[in-house]
């Protein structure tokens, strides 16, 4: 749609519902993923199909999907069955592929293996976390796994400086060093599962994290915003905005933005 007038510029109809994306790639392309895991890349100017690729076939999927990530000439896909792949943006050719499916699942949730957290590409490494209990960093060019930790998550890892921050399905906020994956600190969140307990679908739900001004911010499902020191993980306080939340918060131009399940938009400075 035209941003100034709202006029329809082009549209494309798919034979299956879309579940991932859209991801804008530079100024020329846009990528989406359908329920079958198929990837479609279109030209932004007129909606012409640029290339498409078939996804990994699986018997069971969890509704919802990651959005592709990109950096320079590489497009990162992660999703059903724990599959991770990096493609050449201009051709769709696969550069490398791997999986973060659990080798020894302890629960039905872990056995599904689907990746719900968006992958991250920082130009050097690709970071992906699965709900099956695997968080890994891969060399973006070769696909070599640089390091891995047994963390399960469904939220986008956040990179700030030389650290990556993530929230686990067991209710832990974790900071790691990007270069080698060394754990800097771990903070136990309210409602966290006991140490050693397997991930289940009744664990605490936290959305985020977001890192800004030296603080790590998390939003709980019941509208509690918690703040932590990015250097050491110490709790700095919390604010309740009420409501129920399923959508992760975002940050832009010094503002913290949330959207509740009932459609209420809250903007905080």
Q: Where are the regions that the model predicts?
A:
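Structural signature of WD-repeat beta-propellers
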Residues: 34-35, 79-80, 130-131, 168-169, ...
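Loop/turn-rich, solvent-exposed surfaces of beta-rich toroidal or solenoidal domains
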Residues: 163-178, 182, 186-227
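Extracytoplasmic and endomembrane cell-envelope/extracellular-matrix remodeling and assembly machinery
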Residues: 83-87, 93-99, 109, 138, ...
